[in-house]
Structures are given as structure tokens and as C-alpha cells.
């Protein structure tokens, strides 16, 4: 694991980054109404929980609503019990999870590539339009992305420690707890996705011995203690819960077109290409990390882990018969770390530097075009026929501004200087 020469930022730099992050994720959260259908739905369900005093059975307009587990509803109910505008309160936890995901990218990048990669990964993720924009929306998927990211980051940090080293056991338990919270957020994928990613990593990195270090009994007990009680209570109070929740909402939604959310197999590739602008232009350069490391790839397990994470998420959701844009959010953090590694590699490898320059220039151009188009829509110069779009712009534009700022910082060398602090 790379050891940094210095792992501190100046107080001025920390303050500037903190202010920028707060503005990006929390600025103007209440300046636009809740968007239908999702934001309104995920505000009404917790409101009804508070009104009825029933936190086991979710209801929407009085009708049972078991499409999702209740953790995000509970969090929103807690937020709505505070004084303030409902628009702000309902988006508060999503913004916190989005910012928390940036922190996880920093931890993961720092562990794999050092402090410069960690800081760059955090900047890449935080300034990616899709991540920043959906952090400002009242949707469940950002919470899921955070908990899945926390589970996988805890796994990585735990396996990087020596057996018995201080903090190792806490990280293993953190992995189980985060997977349980992900399960309470959006169902079985909360543990299936981390389990699949970890299995693939152990397979390709040939690190099966890690399994002997996992506290399976205590970890499983912790997972069950967090994830199971609500499922038991919901089944006891609602006879049709088990079939609807496990069969209809998990199996049938994934394997059939019943939800009427079909899209082409390449749908999420396109979403990532646009949603990570300008950094999606840098990702092809990340492929050179694997080509250059062919002979020593087993000595760079971080690359294997990031590839297993990103590719499995992409393939898993691409195979689903139900596709929506936010589903791919959990696959963005490893791509941010890969982009940061590519940017670092570009400083020493001329060919990687050429790839980064060309891809970055294309990404910056596309970002500028996208920002200009959205601005014209907001000003009424372009008519889309989609009435909510001007409201979407309110939280999309800060993300685009962050992306443009990051491009300017990188192009001028200021981002590299910042990451070196």
C-alpha cells in the first residue's frame, strides 16, 4: 500500500474544500419543489408513517407499499419531525449520503494509490454531474450507493491490514453492518452485490485465505440483528408480504418486463458516459493501467478490486429487465478512483498522458455543450415539452459548474497542485 510522504492539508485548503462541498450538496436544497413521482412518493410515505405511528408497514395514500424496505422512510420521517421546509428535510439525507460517498472515495483512493489519488478521486466523484445532481434529489438510490460503498470500502481496508492489527476487526464488522443497512434500504441486493464483488475479487486476485480472517459468526449475527427484525414484523402483520416483497419486487422485477422499465443492454454505458462528464473521457486511459500491469497485475490488487466492483455493477444492472438511471449510482465510486489513478499515471507515462489529454479535452467539450444546452432550456430558448425539466436544472447546474471548475483546475495544473498538498 502506498505510503504518503505527507497526509495533511493546510487549514485554508480544508476550509475551501469544505465550503465547496457544502455548497454543492446542500446549497439551495429547498429552492425547488419536490419532483413527481419519486420525490413526492418518498416524502409522503414517511409523512404517513408519522401520522399513523406505524413504522413497520409503509403506506402511500393509505395503500400498502412494500416495494422497498423502510430504512430510507425512517430517516425521512426523522428528518420531517424537525422544523424546516419539507423540501430541504426530505433531501437532507440524500445529500448527506452523497457527500459521504465522496468521503468513501477519498478513503478508498487513498488506500489504493496514496493521498493524492484519494483527494483526486473525491473531487472526480463530487464533480460528476450524475452523482452530484442525484445527491440533491429525494431518492433511495443514493442511500443504497452509500451503504454498498461503505460495505466494500470496509472490506478493502480490512483486508489491507495485517491479521490482528488494530482496527481490522472493527472494519470487518463495519462491512457486515453496512451490508445489513443496504439490505434495509433496497432489499436483497444489499448483501448480494457486495458478496458477488468480494467473491470475484478473491477469485481473480487469488486471495482465498482472506476468508479465514473474517469473523463470520459475529458478523453474521450482527447482519441478522440489523436486517431481519423488520422483515419478520412485516410478514407477521401482512400475510401477503413475503410473496409480494421477495417474488414480485425482487425476482419478477429483475427477470421480467412487468415493471415496464425496459431499456437496451447498453443503457447504463450511455448513462455513465454522460453522467461522469468530463471524467468519462479520462476512463479509457484507465485501461492502460491494466495493460501496463499485465505482468504484475496480481501485485496491484487495487486494480482488480476496482474492476470487479465497477464491471459487476454494470453487468448486473444491464442484465436486469427493469432499468432506471439512478440504479447505476453504486458503480460510480470505483470509476472515480480509476480515473484518479489514470490521472496520476499520466504524470509519469507519456502514452497515458496523451490518452488523458485527448479524452479530457473531449469530456470538457461535451460538458460545456451540455451546460450550455441546459442553460438555454432554463432560459426558455429551447422547448423540450417536459415541464419538470426547469426544476431539474436547479440541482443539475451546480453539478455541471463543479465539473467545469474541476476541468479548469486540472487544465491549469491547480488540481494537481491541490492534490499534492
What is each stretch, according to the model?
Residues 1-24, 221:
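Start-transfer (signal-anchor) and selected internal transmembrane alpha helices
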Residues 2-5, 169, 173, 289-421:
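Membrane-embedded architecture of ER/inner-membrane glycosylation machinery
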Residues 4, 154-166, 170, 190-224, ...:
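Perimembrane helix-loop-helix junctions
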Residues 13-19, 105-127:
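Transmembrane-helix signature of polytopic, membrane-embedded enzymes
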Residues 23-28, 41-67, 71-74, 78:
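Extracytosolic helix-loop segments that constitute the early lumenal/periplasmic catalytic or substrate-binding loops
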Residues 70, 74, 82-100, 138:
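Loop-to-helix entry region of an early transmembrane alpha helix in multi-pass inner-membrane enzymes
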Residues 92-112, 150:
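Transmembrane-helix motifs of polytopic, lipid-linked glycan transferases
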Residues 136-144:
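Short acidic/glycine- and proline-prone juxtamembrane loop motifs at membrane-interface regions
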Amino acid at each position: 500500500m502506498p505510503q504518503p510522504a505527507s497526509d495533511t492539508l493546510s487549514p485554508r485548503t480544508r476550509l475551501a474544500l469544505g465550503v465547496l462541498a457544502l455548497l454543492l450538496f446542500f446549497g439551495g436544497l429547498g429552492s425547488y419543489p419536490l419532483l413527481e413521482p419519486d420525490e413526492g412518493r418518498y416524502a409522503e410515505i414517511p409523512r404517513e408513517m408519522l401520522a399513523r405511528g406505524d413504522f413497520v408497514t409503509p403506506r402511500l395514500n393509505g395503500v400498502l407499499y412494500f416495494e422497498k424496505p423502510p430504512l430510507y422512510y425512517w430517516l425521512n420521517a426523522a428528518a420531517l419531525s424537525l422544523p424546516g421546509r419539507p423540501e430541504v428535510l426530505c433531501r437532507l439525507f440524500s445529500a448527506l449520503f452523497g457527500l459521504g460517498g465522496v468521503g468513501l472515495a477519498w478513503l478508498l483512493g487513498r488506500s489504493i494509490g496514496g493521498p493524492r489519488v484519494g483527494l483526486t478521486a473525491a473531487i472526480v466523484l463530487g464533480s460528476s454531474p450524475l452523482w452530484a445532481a442525484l445527491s440533491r434529489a429525494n431518492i433511495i438510490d443514493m442511500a443504497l450507493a452509500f451503504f454498498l460503498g461503505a460495505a466494500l470500502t470496509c472490506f478493502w481496508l480490512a483486508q489491507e491490514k495485517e491479521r490482528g492489527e488494530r482496527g481490522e476487526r472493527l472494519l470487518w464488522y463495519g462491512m457486515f453492518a453496512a451490508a445489513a443497512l443496504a439490505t434495509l434500504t433496497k432489499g436483497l441486493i444489499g448483501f448480494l452485490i457486495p458478496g458477488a464483488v468480494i467473491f470475484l475479487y478473491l477469485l481473480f486476485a487469488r486471495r482465498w485465505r482472506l476468508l479465514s480472517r473474517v469473523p463470520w459468526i459475529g458478523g453474521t449475527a450482527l447482519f441478522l440483528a440489523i436486517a431481519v427484525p423488520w422483515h419478520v414484523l412485516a410478514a407477521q402483520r401482512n400475510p401477503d408480504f413475503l410473496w409480494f416483497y421477495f417474488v414480485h419486487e425482487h425476482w419478477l422485477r429483475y427477470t421480467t418486463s412487468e415493471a415496464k422499465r425496459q431499456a437496451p443492454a447498453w443503457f447504463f454505458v450511455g448513462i455513465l458516459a454522460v453522467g461522469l462528464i468530463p471524467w468519462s473521457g479520462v476512463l479509457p486511459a484507465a485501461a492502460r493501467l491494466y495493460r501496463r500491469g499485465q505482468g504484475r497485475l496480481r501485485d496491484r490488487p487495487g486494480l482488480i478490486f476496482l474492476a470487479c466492483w465497477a464491471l459487476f455493477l454494470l453487468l448486473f444492472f444491464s442484465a436486469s429487465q427493469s432499468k432506471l438511471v439512478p440504479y447505476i449510482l453504486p458503480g460510480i465510486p470505483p470509476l472515480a478512483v480509476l480515473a484518479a489513478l489514470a490521472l496520476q499515471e499520466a504524470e509519469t507515462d507519456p502514452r497515458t498522458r496523451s490518452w488523458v489529454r485527448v479524452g479530457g479535452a473531449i469530456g470538457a467539450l461535451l460538458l460545456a455543450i451540455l451546460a450550455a444546452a441546459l442553460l438555454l432550456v432554463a432560459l426558455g430558448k429551447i422547448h423540450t415539452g417536459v415541464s419538470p425539466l426547469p426544476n431539474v436544472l436547479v440541482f443539475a447546474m451546480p453539478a455541471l459548474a463543479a465539473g467545469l471548475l474541476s476541468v479548469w483546475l486540472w487544465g491549469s495544473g491547480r488540481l494537481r497542485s491541490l492534490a499534492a498538498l
